[in-house]
A protein has these predicted regions:
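Outer-membrane beta-barrel channel domains
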Residues: 2-245, 249, 291, 296, ...
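Exposed, low-structure sequence patches enriched in small/polar residues
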Residues: 72, 160, 164-463
Length: 463
């Protein structure tokens, strides 16, 4: 149970640059929703990687966050656990009325509900159902702007295929109800075959997402499409101590294909890629990608401020080279360079990450993401910079500072977060947030946008 809940102690999101016409995916970081979140794994959402970011029937970040504004919570109740072979999770949240004049956003008080029940089968399989009720973003009166979703999924998993191999088959289907007379196809369904093993790692998945599939408490990146993808990775290990095996731990060759069609069967996007990589005995890793993309823009698309791509088909090829140093060292380096064609022009992206651990007490990190676009419709430069500094006097007491700047919003943000765990479940937080905006009035400067400080004591009562 939680009453008058706020999440002031939560770490801020990492800023991202979006060069697609689809929404970005930001992971949940709030402890109240993270605890027991694995019980809501549904269909292929438990498969990891990109499948977490394509469709989730329940996505807890929809609760308490609407269009960048925080919606105050009146209460939150959650029950999760296992009864024999039955897994149960229920989340029920009541929100207060929101009247945000600055964002021109008015939302009435609401009740939001998500229920997930699954039954373990055999040793590693399961069958389950999910139900959600509520639309956090609706501005209509209670009951008039409803959004409900129901779904069923099945997983067959074994670790003894051919004696000692892993294999998983997932199938799922959902339907949602909400008042939209123009969109008739509210269903979604799909399957995934997965063979994740050491020498061969292969998977293939298919998904159908109706144009009316829009779960109020879920996440969907691309409705109104059918999609199929397949990947097969060959990962041999040289004989250690002989020849290449003295230096190389494992080779990777990973071809990948992905197709998107609209519901009338017309091809929208096709991606063909291959990703070679080498992991050395030291733990360092060198990798790359070669990718060919065909994409049809159904409308004029503003890829950056003032840079508009005309609707129509585009073909382009991109390349990536990357390096990641071993994590066992006190310092770590990660480098990625993307380059090649991008729609009607060219794009180059450089990612640099550095981290340093000093005797377990101090951590330092810096990340820079630099994008340079050169198109006939216009040029653009977009950058994100991040700095992290942590001081940990013990596993229970630490101070974390996080600074971010991007030149799209032109905002600089700083969060300082002190956490003291008195005992498991009982914590004290002292959090300070401050933001600035880069302006030219009349000279270049960072103008303060505001600050916010919070002192919070979190107590857990366990019967």
């Amino acid at each position: 149970m939680s009453v008058n809940t706020d999440f002031a102690e939560t770490e801020v999101d990492e800023r991202q640059i979006n060069l697609t016409r689809f929404p970005l995916f930001f992971p949940e970081k709030r402890t109240f929703f993270l605890e027991g979140s694995e019980y809501f794994n549904f269909g292929t959402s438990s498969g990891g990687g990109q499948y977490h970011a394509s469709f989730l029937p329940f996505f807890s970040r929809r609760v308490g966050l609407v269009a960048g504004s925080q919606v105050p919570l009146l209460f939150g109740a959650k029950v999760f656990g296992r009864l024999g072979d039955t897994n149960i999770s229920v989340v029920d949240v009541g929100t207060r009325r929101l009247d945000d004049a600055a964002a021109a956003l008015v939302l009435p008080a609401k009740n939001l509900l998500a229920v997930r029940v699954s039954q373990n089968l055999w040793e590693e399989s399961r069958v389950g159902v999910i139900f959600t009720d509520g639309n956090p973003a609706s501005s209509g009166p209670a009951g008039a702007d409803y959004n409900r979703l129901a779904g069923v999924d099945f997983r067959y998993a074994t670790s003894r295929l051919f004696g000692d191999k892993n294999f998983t088959f997932d199938a799922w289907g959902v339907y949602d109800w909400w008042p939209d007379p123009d969109r008739k196809k509210h269903q979604g369904y799909g399957f995934r075959l997965d063979y994740p093993n050491d020498l061969w790692d292969m998977n293939s998945s298919y998904g159908y997402y109706g144009d009316g599939l829009d779960p109020g408490l879920g996440f969907i990146s691309r409705p109104g499409v059918r999609t199929w993808s397949a990947m097969g990775a060959f990962m041999p290990r040289p004989d250690p101590g002989r020849g290449l095996g003295r230096y190389v731990r494992q080779f990777f060759v990973e071809p990948y294909v992905e197709f998107y069609w609209d519901l009338a069967g017309r091809l929208e996007t096709r991606t063909l890629a291959v990703s070679p990589a080498v992991q050395f005995q030291s733990g360092d890793r060198v990798e790359g990608d070669i990718s060919s993309t065909y994409d049809v823009l159904p409308f004029d698309f503003e890829v950056a401020d003032g840079v508009v791509l005309p609707m129509g088909p585009y073909r382009y090829a991109t390349f990536r080279v990357g390096f990641e140093s071993a994590s066992h060292r006190p310092w770590q380096v990660e480098l990625n360079r993307h380059f090649g064609r991008f729609y009607s022009g060219r794009l180059a992206e450089t990612e640099v990450g550095l981290s340093l651990r000093l005797k377990g007490y101090v951590t330092l990190g810096a990340v820079a993401n630099l994008i340079r676009g050169r198109l006939p419709q216009g040029d653009f430069d977009e950058n994100v910079y991040e700095l992290k500094a942590g001081l940990f006097l013990s596993p229970d007491l630490g101070l974390m500072n996080y600074v971010q700047y991007d030149d799209v919003s032109k905002q600089l943000g700083w969060q300082s977060r002190l956490r003291w765990q008195i005992m498991p479940g009982n914590e004290v937080f002292l959090v300070y947030n401050r933001n600035w905006e880069r302006r030219w009035d009349p000279m270049r400067r960072f103008a303060p946008l505001g600050d916010h400080g919070v002192f919070k004591v979190q107590l857990t009562i366990r019967p």
